[in-house]
From Swiss-Prot:
This is Large ribosomal subunit protein bL34. Gene3D superfamilies: 1.10.287.3980. The lineage of its organism: Bacteria, Pseudomonadati, Pseudomonadota, Alphaproteobacteria, Hyphomonadales. One of its GO terms (cellular component) is ribonucleoprotein complex. It comes from Hyphomonas neptunium (strain ATCC 15444). GO terms for molecular function: structural constituent of ribosome. Pfam families: Ribosomal_L34 (PF00468).
Length: 44
């Protein structure tokens, strides 16, 4: 059986990257929460 996780840095960035987060209101909420929590890395 094929494994479900086939890593790709390009797909990772396009789906979970900074610009993708900034493109929606909820994505900006995600970034705000992660900043408030003090995360070292905000996005993938």
């Amino acid at each position: 059986m094929k494994r479900t996780f086939q890593p790709s840095n390009l797909r990772r960035a396009r789906t979970h990257g900074f610009r993708e987060r900034m493109s929606t209101k909820n994505g900006r909420k995600v970034l705000a929460r992660r900043r408030a929590k003090g995360r070292k890395t905000l996005t993938a």
